[in-house]
A protein has these predicted regions:
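Membrane-proximal, proline-rich intrinsically disordered regions
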Residues: 20-65, 303-314, 321-322, 520-536
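Hydrophobic, small-residue-rich alpha-helical packing segments that form membrane-like cores
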Residues: 153, 157-256
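Polar, glycine-rich mid-to-C-terminal structural blocks
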Residues: 211-221, 226-320
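Flexible, polar/acidic helix-loop-strand segments at domain edges
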Residues: 261, 318-402
């Protein structure tokens, strides 16, 4: 595919542009030289470099590890400091995210400044490329505001001197800009149905609607969430045709990339531009290395029984002696547990392979130390049998999909007027049907629930459907539920020594935002004061 070819180039080119792409450093390589901009192809290279800077697998897994879904048990790094309530403005993770995001914005501004130099460029192609770069810039600013709140904001390239005097702009102004940008560019972009095969993976009008909905979701602007989700649910002739992919596990199979559920993803190129985080999440017997990032028990406990009951409610058929039997099939598609039928669930040509994790059970056994799992679980979702021996995978990372649209719509309806049977039947029910539920109690609208009970059902459905996809931490932040979900003891399977797991601490007045990096404040005192709780 043409996009993957350009991304392969971008993977090399980004090193040249971004190595000096911090906000305070102006790059001096050929991409900023007027002489570079001689063809549409060269402009496309820079555009696709911006695509590669917008999001990546590392960010997704890092975000997930900050939530209550995953636990990075071997780390002694910045993430652990954040999770334990010990973060300071000097953490490298704060500095590196800041640098990388402004590096992507720098690429966008270079493109916007230089693209008019390209001779004989088709006007419609240029308009579309400009719309794509503006979408990428909006996405980068959205992430910046989610992490840091008020940040430096500018819409054209700035000089070194300007970068060391610019002040922070309030989040509300930046969010308003994002919404207007997305509204302004949508008509310059094709729908999913209009994309030629070689352009699969590029930004579409549907992706604009999905990002609009997600930005409004962070602000609990429910009416606008419903508006933009409705565009994708009920106006598909205008915004593109989307549907749930029939097989939940198959969504995360390289063979099914760019299917009808995918609104936006981060494209990779097998054997060329890859990601390798899975090597530290899978069983040692299947190619794992030092298992760092593993699911938490609280996530496992959220999956329903096939009967539709939770594991703890009255009348449940949950059996603690066989805790994974008769559970929501998405559990098996997402998490590897003790007694996991590997050969039955992973198409890698193996025969009769079972993953045993209980102490003393073999290579993958929990031992409370070493390189094995710290919670008694491994990660299944996004495992790629076609990856290299060291788990370098060319599988795309999904950033937006249609199930998320249905879940956002369901949440927005409930928070405004209350969930109804009609809305349930076009949102939660089809998601559960696709997952493999057949029992009426699981599929039918649960009448008689209180507002809070229904809210929890919707939130739990979102958690299990989107688990290990990088969204949970942001959901907790927007719900202002940090103390509920991000404080207290990390739990593992029944055979795990929980004394060896962390106790998390969430400071309500501080931890919804990261600190502005102290290195940036040292360069530019106008960035002070820092966010609450981090000092000046």
């Amino acid at each position: 595919m043409r996009l993957r070819k350009y991304i392969a180039f971008a993977g090399m080119a980004v090193l040249m542009l971004c190595s000096c792409n911090e906000m305070e450093n102006a790059p001096t390589n050929k991409f900023t030289d007027n002489s570079y901009w001689t063809s549409t192809t060269k402009a496309q290279y820079v555009l696709n470099m911006a695509y590669s800077q917008m999001y990546n697998a590392g960010r997704m897994w890092s975000d997930e590890s900050l939530s209550d879904n995953a636990y990075d048990g071997r780390s002694v790094d910045d993430q652990r400091a954040i999770r334990k309530g010990m973060a300071t403005p000097s953490l490298d993770i704060f500095k590196n995210e800041w640098k990388d995001l402004y590096g992507g914005i720098k690429t966008c501004h270079v493109f916007l400044e230089k693209v008019d130099l390209v001779p004989n460029m088709d006007a419609s192609v240029k308009a579309r490329m400009i719309a794509e770069i503006r979408y990428i810039r909006a996405s980068l600013y959205f992430r910046l505001t989610n992490l840091y709140g008020a940040v430096p904001f500018f819409t054209e390239d700035i000089t070194l001197e300007e970068s060391r005097s610019v002040s922070r702009t309030d989040r509300e102004t930046i969010i308003s800009f994002i919404h207007q940008e997305l509204e302004d560019i949508k008509d310059a972009l094709p729908t999913r149905d209009q994309l030629p095969e070689e352009d699969k993976g590029k930004i579409t009008k549907g992706a604009v609607c999905a990002l609009q909905a997600r930005v409004y979701l962070m602000d609990s602007d429910w009416n606008n969430v419903m508006l933009y989700c409705d565009n994708l649910m009920n106006k598909q002739g205008e915004y593109g045709t989307y549907a749930l992919f029939p097989d939940y596990a198959g969504l995360f199979d390289e063979a099914n990339e760019y299917n009808e559920e995918i609104i936006m993803d981060r494209s990779y190129v097998p054997n060329l531009i890859t990601w390798g985080e899975m090597v530290d999440m899978i069983p040692l017997s299947r190619g794992g290395r030092a298992v760092n990032r593993v699911p938490q028990q609280s996530l496992v406990d959220t999956y329903l029984m096939l009967s539709g009951k939770t594991i703890s409610e009255a009348g449940t058929d949950y059996n603690p002696a066989y805790p994974y039997d008769n559970r929501d099939p998405r559990l098996t598609a997402t998490i590897i547990y003790d007694g996991y039928d590997w050969s039955g669930n992973v198409d890698d040509g193996s025969k009769d392979v079972v993953i045993n994790i209980r102490p003393g059970s073999g290579t993958d056994a929990y031992d409370g130390g070493g390189n094995g799992t710290s919670t008694g679980y491994f990660t299944r979702k996004y495992y790629n049998p076609q990856a290299s021996g060291d788990q370098n995978s060319g599988m795309n990372i999904i950033t937006m999909r249609y199930a998320d649209i249905l879940l956002m719509y369901a949440e927005a309806v409930h928070e405004t007027s209350g969930m109804t049977e009609a809305v349930w039947n076009k949102t939660i029910r089809p998601i559960r049907e696709r997952a493999g539920f057949t029992a009426d109690a699981a599929l039918n609208f649960p009448a008689g629930k209180s507002k809070e009970e229904m809210r929890q059902i919707i939130r739990d459905e979102r958690r299990v459907e989107m688990a290990m996809e990088g969204l949970r931490w942001y959901d907790i932040k927007r719900w202002k539920a940090g103390n509920e979900y991000l404080s207290g003891k990390v739990r593992g399977a029944s055979f795990v020594d929980e004394n060896k797991l962390d106790t998390r601490k969430f400071e309500e007045a501080r931890d919804y935002l990261w600190a502005v990096p102290i290195s940036e404040i040292n360069l530019n005192p106008n960035l002070a004061p820092n966010n609450p709780g981090y000092g000046n």
